[in-house]
């Protein structure tokens, strides 16, 4: 009796398998793949680990994309945003600081009041608030947000330099020969304070690269179809829970190297251009 039941079960199982094969012609292929990859988490992790060590220096993400290629492409986005936003902030801060320091009086008071409003709000909170209000992701949006909010320190330094230089003899000589105010501001005074502006430009590149990473990590930065270090860190959160740490390591290592290199470059540039150290 028992043998007859076993035979009937075997026949029914075979009929089910044959039915599955008829409905899904790839059933045999999928079954073979499941046997190769394994059904447990340890087996899948071993396969990914083997690929990471044997084929890809930094492994692959959950979609199978090369992490090294992603981190290189992400560096392009972060550097582009950092440089573009630093240029916007430097131009804005230099122009406003030049007008405030050169003209003084009510112009200086109005621009200082404008500066006080921006500087009284913590920078990161201001950036996050503006990004949340705009609700429009994109590289240009991030550049404008960072550039239009990060000009305050440049304004303060440029204003102080113009207050100091506008009363010097070479500016008075330019006034005596009939040079206009704009010419005195940007042709005679600006070349003598350009070292301050260049150093601030380099410092703000580092600041804005880190700010872009923070924005993209929180979901307020570049869109999902644009690779950046911040979006890679965002993706690596779920992977880190499963033990896939290499995307997080790649993004952080590349960012640390770039920020350290720019910081060393800024220190060297300050030493080379500062007239007090010559």
List each language-model region with its residue ranges:
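Membrane-topology segments of multi-pass transport proteins
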Residues: 1-63
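Alpha-helical transmembrane segments of integral membrane proteins
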Residues: 60-278
